Amino acid sequence: MKISIINSGSGNIASLKNMLSFLGYNPVVCDQVEDLNKSDFIFLPGVGSFDNVIKNLKQKNFYDYLKEKKNFDNSILIGICVGMQLLFESSEEGTEKGLNLLSGKIKKFSVKNIKVPHMGWNSVFGDNFYKNCNGKR
């Protein structure tokens, strides 16, 4: 099984790689589009500014590749943090267009008493869909 992590120039790539390694996988950090070929899973991490990560993806040619869903029809794409937001059309927190793989726009929190970004650990409970991760830390 080939697991690829896109080097989006943002995100905690080392932590993601370490977690996948801990689970017994051998993830590959990809710096160019060609590295994604024949991936079973593609992780798109990102931290910080929506626009910054989009610009990084464009600079490395990942943006155009990811916009064309047919390029990874046989792969599962998983967005983490800002990487998940990039899958949508756009964000109220930026001017760049998203990948438009999912319909919708990322909205800014309007509630003032929510601490953003949320930092720290939470309890996570799996379900049958994620049974291979059940009980793993």
Question: Where do the model's predicted regions map?
Answer:
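Cysteine-nucleophile active-site neighborhood
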Residues: 48-118
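Short glycine-rich hinge loops at helix-strand junctions in the catalytic core
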Residues: 24
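Short hydrophobic segments within beta-strands
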Residues: 6-8
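Short acidic low-complexity segments
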Residues: 27-38
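Active-site oxyanion/phosphate-handling segment shared across diverse enzymes
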Residues: 121-137
